[in-house]
Amino acid sequence: MGIIQKGLVGLIGKDYYIRHLSIINPFLPVELTPKEREVLGTFMSFRGDVADKDRFSTYFRKEVKEALKLSDGGLSNHLKALKDKGAIREELNGSITIASFLLPAEKQQFYQFKIVEG
């Protein structure tokens, strides 16, 4: 089998980030569930100064809950699981950040990997 190449064009907003997380998920130390990828991808999709300062603020949590039809408890459970898996972490100042190894390039992301038998 030769090299497999596939380009994905037209992924917008959270779909871009969810697809990115789905592609890298098998390579993570602890895989994220589909819903965890959806929650994190939605948070990753927010833009602007406010999002850059506090992406997990009450305002953005409300947006995620509405977009994904989650209860307060449901979102809290997913955020706890993401913390436990190292995908997000709480900083000394109390803000929550996304692990840098999960962040894709903004407009397009390239992937390259190889599997070797034996």
Tell me the role of every PLM-derived stretch:
Residues Y59-G73:
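Short helix-coil junctions and helix-kink-helix linkers
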Residues K69-D84:
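Short amphipathic alpha-helical interaction segments
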Residues K80-I96:
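A short, conserved structural fragment
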Residues M1-L28:
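Long, low-complexity, charged/polar intrinsically disordered regions in eukaryotic proteins
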